[in-house]
Amino acid sequence: MHCERFLCILRIIGTTLFGVSLLLGITAAYIVGYQFIQTDNYYFSFGLYGAFLASHLIIQSLFAFLEHRKMKKSLETPIKLNKTVALCIAAYQEDPDYLRKCLQSVKRLTYPGIKVVMVIDGNSEDDLYMMDIFSEVMGRDKSATYIWKNNFHEKGPGETDESHKESSQHVTQLVLSNKSICIMQKWGGKREVMYTAFRALGRSVDYVQVCDSDTMLDPASSVEMVKVLEEDPMVGGVGGDVQILNKYDSWISFLSSVRYWMAFNIERACQSYFGCVQCISGPLGMYRNSLLHEFVEDWYNQEFMGNQCSFGDDRHLTNRVLSLGYATKYTARSKCLTETPIEYLRWLNQQTRWSKSYFREWLYNAMWFHKHHLWMTYEAIITGFFPFFLIATVIQLFYRGKIWNILLFLLTVQLVGLIKSSFASCLRGNIVMVFMSLYSVLYMSSLLPAKMFAIATINKAGWGTSGRKTIVVNFIGLIPVSVWFTILLGGVIFTIYKESKRPFSESKQTVLIVGTLLYACYWVMLLTLYVVLINKCGRRKKGQQYDMVLDV
């Protein structure tokens, strides 16, 4: 016992020293600015900090590639599918078409005897359509429904403690005695909905799968996640490959689709290699039920800065699994399609909310770095502090008073994006990933300021993405973007003022013209390819019935 405690202390000290040393090393490399390659007049340079970031991308991609190879090799052996599984669907003001497609995909799941529990966040007349769709698709004679005036933590109007206890027991009994059931309950947020399903199921099943009501599951999705959990008893949770259902509806949803592929099949695949996936996404995840009930109350009652948390439910659920020392994995063999915002403002609000949960959960995550591979500490430091270094770099370049610095920055952003997307195209075997380089512009212009705004308002939970039946537009997300653009515009004006006071040399003019032409040609080429792709694939997908998950 004392030996284990001593080893734990050593691991805590070791991971802390590693993390601090890594951060100090990166900061020193950034401040010193040592250059390996440097041309006359500083038209091009490549330094220590740039070399470190390039090495990170290469190493991350290598481990992702190795994890994909491991998925193909280790999971070919069939296993017995004799464990019980329950699928929990969280629904809130869902678009009727998406909900119907979700439930139709649930009926096609190939895992034997899977139990389906859908909990609707809201019990008003406006929410009844979701229950009607559930009964229609799942079969009125094969499913049960119940309108609950309460939820497990709040009483409805006119309820007493005794009647609330009785109704809670009734809901639990309904869930346990029916293979398919839909419950409408008093509004309380997604975490409340998930808690109802977890609490009512109790320990009656071996594995619990989570799913959102806008998600279409591949028939084999449950089977493939069970395989991962069955293969290693120390894996506590597993997530699958989330793809975009409405990718051709707008430029935002299209860029999100390529970003999703990169996030899951490069970043999370790399994390999976070391058993430390930091977020099992809500649309497609599975957990060991025995673990779930070790922390479900702590998960529900999570507080941050004195307030109960109302977002970041899936990330904190993953964090709780990691806190127990269990591994979290990703499998590309389990797939689903899910909806993503098609309007810029709704996307921005979604990203800000996700960024809030990321930075909040980063702090929780740091408490159990010592329980996992050093890669978990390494990646948390890199991804957590990268936005700050990037903002410092952008402001520095824009306010140096040299127009070439601004142009070089724009070219570098696209070049790095193009290199990364080219590798992804090879790994995926699909040229569409080349558009990932366009996402870098969206990241620099919108996501970067959204991350800073998320930190500044991390304890504010009053807004985010809305239900899909009624889209609510929130303009608050434009505040950080407007401030960011004002800062950049100030740098451009300052640069123009400084450059106007000194004549351009012939070599400088040549470099600027060549750089501008390269940048313009890049955009013309990518935008042309985008128009061609949308015209070709968008029409083909329009009105198509999704019988299975497609990777297009």
From Swiss-Prot:
Enzyme Commission number(s) from the entry: 2.4.1.212
Expression by tissue: Expressed in fibroblasts.
Reported cofactor(s): Mg(2+)
InterPro entries (alphabetical): Nucleotide-diphossugar_trans (IPR029044)
One annotated Gene Ontology cellular component of this protein: plasma membrane raft
Induction entry: During cell cycle progression is induced at the G1-S and G2-M transitions. Up-regulated in a panel of cancer cell lines.
TM segment ranges: 12-32, 46-66, 375-395, 403-423, 430-450, 476-496, 511-531
Outcome, altering residue 221 to A: Prevents O-GlcNAcylation. Increases protein stability. Reduces hyaluronan synthase activity
Glycosylation site positions: 221
Topology Cytoplasmic: residue spans: 1-11, 67-374, 424-429, 497-510
Main location: membrane
The protein's annotated pathway: Glycan biosynthesis; hyaluronan biosynthesis
Keyword Chaperone: no
Subcellular location: Cell membrane; Endoplasmic reticulum membrane; Vesicle; Golgi apparatus membrane
Activity regulation, free text: Regulated by several post-translational modifications such as ubiquitination/deubiquitination, phosphorylation and O-GlcNAcylation. The enzymatic activity depends on the availability of UDP-GlcUA and UDP-GlcNAc.
GO biological process, one term: bone morphogenesis
Similarity annotation: Belongs to the NodC/HAS family.
Function statement: Catalyzes the addition of GlcNAc or GlcUA monosaccharides to the nascent hyaluronan polymer. Therefore, it is essential to hyaluronan synthesis a major component of most extracellular matrices that has a structural role in tissues architectures and regulates cell adhesion, migration and differentiation. This is one of three isoenzymes responsible for cellular hyaluronan synthesis and it is particularly responsible for the synthesis of high molecular mass hyaluronan.
Protein name per the record: Hyaluronan synthase 2
Encoding gene per record: HAS2
